[in-house]
C-alpha cells in the first residue's frame, strides 16, 4: 500500500484507511514530508530529529493557526506528523515505511517552482539569480521518489527515510545553468546576495522559488534512504525532462499553489537596478 495523500486527508482519515487495510496490506508506505520535523527549515536534520506534535486521530482543523499569527506555519507539518503516527499505530514499526521527501520536482509538477524558472529562462534577458551560486540544494525527482516508494513497499524493513538528493551534489548555480541550457541560453544570470534580497523584502521560497536562507532547508541527511536503494538522478536530467514535458504540451493539474510562485517582471528589473545602485529605496512591491 502506497499512500500519497496530502494534508487534505487528515490523520484520522489515514488512521481509518490503515485500519481497513491492515489485514490485506503487507506494508504501508506513507509519503510524508520534511515539514513534519520540528526543526525544519532552521536546523540540519536526520531521521532521528524530533517531529512536530500531531495525534493519530486529529481532524483537519488540528494545528490551524489563529488569524494574525506571524510565527512558523506548522499546520501542514503537524497534519503529516499525525498521519505518520496513525500509520505506526496500526501497522507497527516493521510494516510502516515513512518517506519524508523535501522539494519534489519533475514532469507533471503542479506547484510551479521548476516551471517558473524554466519559463523565466526562456524569456531571456538579465535574470535575477538569488544568493550564492555555490549553495547546495537537494530537490528530488518525482520519478525517483516513485521508484523508491514501490521498492520499499516490496522489501522494506520499515522505518523513516529522508528522501532528498545528497548534500553538496547540486547547487543553485548548476540548477539555474541547466534551466538556461535547455531553453536555449537566451538569458544571463545576475547573482544578488541574500542580504540585499532580504532587505528588499523579497519573499523567500515563493517570489524566487527554491531560494531560502535558513540553515537547515537544504541540510537533510539522506544516507539511510540511499543505503536502502534510493537513487537520485542528476538535477539537470530533471530540468531537461520537465522542459520537454512543458514543450510537448504538458499541463499540470489545477492547484491553488500554482499561482504563488515567481517574481513579477517589473519588480525583478527594479530589484536589479537597485542592486546596481546598491539601494533598496522604493523597490518594495
Language model regions located:
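NAD(P)H-binding glycine-rich loop region in Rossmannoid oxidoreductase-like domains
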Residues: 1-26, 30, 36-39
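Conserved beta-loop-beta element that borders a ligand/cofactor-binding pocket
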Residues: 32, 83-108
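Active-site "gating" loop of Rossmann-like NAD(P)-dependent oxidoreductase/epimerase domains
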Residues: 34-75, 89-92
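Conserved sequence/active-site signature of Rossmann-fold short-chain dehydrogenase/reductase
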Residues: 36, 104-106, 168
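Active-site helix of classical SDR
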Residues: 79
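Substrate-positioning beta->alpha
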Residues: 111-117, 130-155, 159-162, 237
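A short C-terminal helix-loop "cap" of Rossmann-like NAD(P)-dependent dehydrogenase/epimerase domains
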Residues: 118-130, 185-186, 217
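Mid/C-terminal beta-alpha module of Rossmann-like enzyme folds, strongest
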Residues: 151-214, 221, 243-245, 250-285
